[in-house]
């Protein structure tokens, strides 16, 4: 059998012109990315094409951990492992962010306060039930107790983002069958309720999902636009940022259905400015 050498792929003016043409026709960044992958472009090269061709100059500053080539980061009171990172979209998977005792303490404190999870009501700026989200959850106020304060300070140092720009820590419980269908965390400027939401700290620019309890099966955090699934591992976390409220950030994500056992997570959303 003859061995064939795999030819390297490079970003060319021709493929960039094609991407610009597709964007001009109104196709979204996720749709263009999927078309590149379907036509044979490798995932990392396709993302590079998108990043170089559809740069968005209107983006705002976002949390961005100073990782470089480091395998672990100093988060103040804890050394946190860097397990995976990518640049487009900006995603980092952290290990050892929380101890087992901290995971247990958060779940124990949250359990008696759980209720059916709500989502932002985009028409009014309030909250509402949404069939896309079937978890139970609660919010700690920022700095509510020593445990929450300690974890929030660790997150602020790890992500190099002001502590006061974070929303309160949310804890969620997913029972078998529970899920959160793919969505974006930023607030859509086209919705009538967004203006009032932004008064409390501006746009969301980053999300950190911390895994407190592992299910027996299912429950991955999925990023459909880039074909990534992050398996929930106790004490680990996944972080991603988005510099504009647009699908071109490729941060569409969701929580796959839990097939067996329970999944517990804590979510920290980060705003442009101080969250009040």
Name each model-derived stretch.
Residues 1-239, 243-276:
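Fe(II)/2-oxoglutarate oxygenase catalytic core
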């Amino acid at each position: 059998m003859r061995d064939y050498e795999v030819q390297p792929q490079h970003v060319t003016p021709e493929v960039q012109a094609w991407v610009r043409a597709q964007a001009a026709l109104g196709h979204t960044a996720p749709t263009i990315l999927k078309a590149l992958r379907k036509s044979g472009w490798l995932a990392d090269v396709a993302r590079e094409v998108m990043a170089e061709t559809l740069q968005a100059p209107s983006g705002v500053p976002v949390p961005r951990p100073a990782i470089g080539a480091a395998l672990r980061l100093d988060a103040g009171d804890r050394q946190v492992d860097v397990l995976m990172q990518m640049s487009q979209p900006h995603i980092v998977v952290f290990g050892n962010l929380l101890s087992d005792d901290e995971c247990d303490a958060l779940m124990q404190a949250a359990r008696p306060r759980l209720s059916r999870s709500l989502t932002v009501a985009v028409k009014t700026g309030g909250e509402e039930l949404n069939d896309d989200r079937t978890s139970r959850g609660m919010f700690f106020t920022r700095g509510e107790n020593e445990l929450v304060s300690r974890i929030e300070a660790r997150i602020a140092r790890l992500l190099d983002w002001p502590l006061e720009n974070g929303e309160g820590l949310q804890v969620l419980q997913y029972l078998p069958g529970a899920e959160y269908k793919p969505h974006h965390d930023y607030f859509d400027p086209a919705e009538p309720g967004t203006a009032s939401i932004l008064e409390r700290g501006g746009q969301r620019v980053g999300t950190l999902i911390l895994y407190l309890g592992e299910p027996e099966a299912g429950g991955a955090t999925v990023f459909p636009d880039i074909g990534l699934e992050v398996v929930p591992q106790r004490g680990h976390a996944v972080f991603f940022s988005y510099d504009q409220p647009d699908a071109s950030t490729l941060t569409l994500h969701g929580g796959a259905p839990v097939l067996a056992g329970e999944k517990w997570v804590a979510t920290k959303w980060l705003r442009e400015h101080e969250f009040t």
